[in-house]
């Protein structure tokens, strides 16, 4: 596997010798979020902050360097001990710098792309328009990933290879292989050690159909497979396989607004894992009123070894300007131990020429 990784990187570098040099182009983006959380049942509060900086630098023909780093800071801790997660920007540990991506991307024509380097699963697979509206962590990456594997989901990164192929218009094939253990420690991120860390692979087939509205109809089926260290004995590598799917189906138009059905689910082939399965369903309406607000409701349910959890989220995203937005959200959580209601208020600032 190590030889394959080195070989693909060498192929990317070799492509420069056969391509004409182009003037570098630099794209950048900066995202800052601050979020207040309030557990209305027990009165606990928390303040969460997130900063993300990304850059894309054009190199030779068809090639670019992609980089992204984040900083996280929170005060008050988690407002409850649920596994689904109320916030997709919350991290337990405060860190001023986490490198999430540092990779080389090479396109071969308009239909085949290869990226090699430090990467993140969330950015590669889970950034669709409908799921991206919601604040819950389960909509940012599926619980069967973050709870069953020590892989590169927020806020971690891992060395890997990511492939994308578009054989026909609307159809996208993706496949990735990552180091089996991800990290946010700079000294451990740039390692590919299948013998000790194992490997993790994920892939999917997606098909999009254009519609009259802003968002296309999208259908995705994917798999996950990992041979990663056991949670009981880190020296033992265990094989775990699962499957996941995502549906984003526009239902109707109301003026310029579009009503979209969201459906997602995942299941593991083994039952003796932390998270055996997950499903979610909801509705999203975009381009509401003059400032193009987006509103949605979603219900997420997780089958966890210690007990099932269900989270119902209602949220609305309001643009105040082209770069400033506010988003309140309400979560009603049915926990295997207790129930609670929590509110979030998120303010976001987005700048850059590559948004």
List each language-model region with its residue ranges:
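Repeated loop/turn-to-beta-strand initiation elements of outer-membrane beta-barrel proteins
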Residues: 26-28, 62-65, 111-114, 169-175, ...
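Outer membrane beta-barrel
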Residues: 52, 56-180, 273-282, 286-288, ...
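Residues that define the transmembrane beta-barrel architecture of outer-membrane proteins
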Residues: 36-38, 45-51, 96-100, 155-159, ...
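Transmembrane beta-strand segments of Gram-negative outer membrane beta-barrel proteins
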Residues: 21-39, 63-67, 136-137, 143, ...
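Detector for outer-membrane/organellar transmembrane beta-barrel domains
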Residues: 207-303, 314
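Residues on the lipid-exposed face of transmembrane beta-strands in outer-membrane beta-barrel proteins
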Residues: 53-57, 102-106, 161-165, 203-209, ...
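Outer-membrane beta-barrel "beta-signal"
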Residues: 339-355
């Amino acid at each position: 596997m190590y030889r394959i990784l080195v070989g693909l990187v060498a192929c990317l570098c070799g492509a420069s010798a056969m391509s004409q040099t182009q003037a570098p182009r630099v794209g950048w983006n900066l995202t800052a979020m601050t979020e207040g959380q309030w557990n209305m049942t027990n009165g606990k509060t928390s303040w969460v902050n997130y900063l993300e900086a990304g850059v894309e630098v054009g190199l030779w023909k068809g090639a670019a360097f992609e980089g992204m780093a984040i900083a996280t800071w929170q005060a008050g801790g988690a407002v409850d001990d649920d596994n689904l997660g109320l916030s997709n920007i919350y991290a337990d540990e405060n860190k001023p710098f986490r490198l999430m991506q540092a990779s080389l991307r090479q396109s071969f024509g308009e239909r085949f792309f290869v990226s090699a380097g430090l990467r993140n699963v969330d950015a590669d697979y889970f950034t669709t328009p409908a799921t991206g509206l919601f604040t819950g962590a389960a909509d940012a990456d599926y619980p069967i990933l973050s709870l069953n594997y020590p892989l590169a989901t927020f806020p971690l990164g891992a060395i890997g290879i990511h492939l994308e192929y578009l054989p026909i218009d609307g159809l996208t094939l993706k496949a990735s292989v990552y180091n089996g253990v991800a990290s946010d420690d700079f000294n451990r991120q740039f390692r590919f050690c299948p013998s000790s860390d194992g490997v993790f692979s994920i892939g999917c087939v997606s098909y999009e159909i254009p519609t009259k509205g802003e968002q296309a109809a999208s259908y995705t089926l994917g798999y996950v497979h990992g041979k990663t260290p056991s949670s009981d004995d880190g020296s033992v590598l265990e094989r775990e396989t699962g499957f996941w799917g995502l549906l984003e189906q526009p239902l109707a138009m109301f003026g310029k607004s579009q009503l979209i059905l969201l459906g997602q689910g995942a299941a593991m082939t083994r039952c003796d894992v932390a998270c055996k399965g997950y499903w979610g369903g909801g509705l999203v309406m975009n381009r509401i009123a003059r400032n193009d607000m987006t509103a949605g409701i979603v219900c997420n349910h997780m089958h966890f070894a210690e007990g099932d959890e269900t989270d119902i989220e209602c949220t609305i995203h309001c643009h105040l300007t082209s770069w400033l937005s506010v988003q309140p959200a309400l979560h009603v959580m049915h926990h295997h131990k207790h129930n609670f209601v929590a509110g979030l208020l998120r303010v976001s600032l987005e700048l850059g020429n590559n948004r």
